[in-house]
Amino acid sequence: MSSKRRQALRDFYNLPGSNSSSSTVSTTRKPSSSNTVSPVEETALDKVDPEFSDPNFDSNAYVSKFMEKATPAELLQRDKSLVASIQGLSVDHRSLVYNHYKHLLEASDAINSFCKNLNTLLPALNDAYQACPKPTRKNGNNDTYSAPQSFNGNEFSAP
């Protein structure tokens, strides 16, 4: 991979450069110059129009009404802000999918490892169980504990 590509990836993910001594990674992404959204626009995107929550919301009517009211500059600005939001959500979505997939693979590997080791651990568990003293009744108390008497490798059997 060329050094320009590596640098572009480092810039995109806010990773420290190869000559950087810092080991911290920033969690905020710098927007690209073509899709820059001002903080004012970002706060405007955070405010959701209550009309969107209406069960009878008609997206076509909303867009038509907005297009009639807005100037071409406002339309372009809204387009830029929506594209930037969609790209940000897309990056977040890919990140979530990758992270969860990675955790799923790790959990699957752990379960497979446990299942492979289970057959060797069951006889040792049975030996440890047999070595334990059995509970007995004390002082004629009627509160008794009925402990299983043996372990046959897969399940405990009652007395």
Curated annotation (Swiss-Prot):
UniProt protein name: Vacuolar protein sorting-associated protein 51
GO biological process annotation, one example: Golgi to vacuole transport
Stretches of the chain forming a coiled coil according to its record: none
Keyword annotations: Cytoplasm, Endosome, Golgi apparatus, Membrane, Nucleus, Phosphoprotein, Protein transport, Transport
Function: Involved in retrograde transport from early and late endosomes to late Golgi, leading to the membrane fusion between late Golgi and endosomal vesicles.
Keyword Coiled coil assigned: no
Compositionally biased spans, kind Low complexity: 18-34
Natural source organism: Schizosaccharomyces pombe (strain 972 / ATCC 24843) (Fission yeast)
Signal peptide residues on this chain, from the entry's feature table: none
Subunit comment: Component of the Golgi-associated retrograde protein (GARP) complex.
Membrane topology: Peripheral membrane protein
Subcellular location: Cytoplasm; Nucleus; Golgi apparatus, trans-Golgi network membrane; Endosome membrane
Stretches with biased composition (Polar residues): 138-159
Pfam families cross-referenced by the UniProt entry: VPS51_Exo84_N
Positions of post-translational Phosphoserine modification: 18, 21
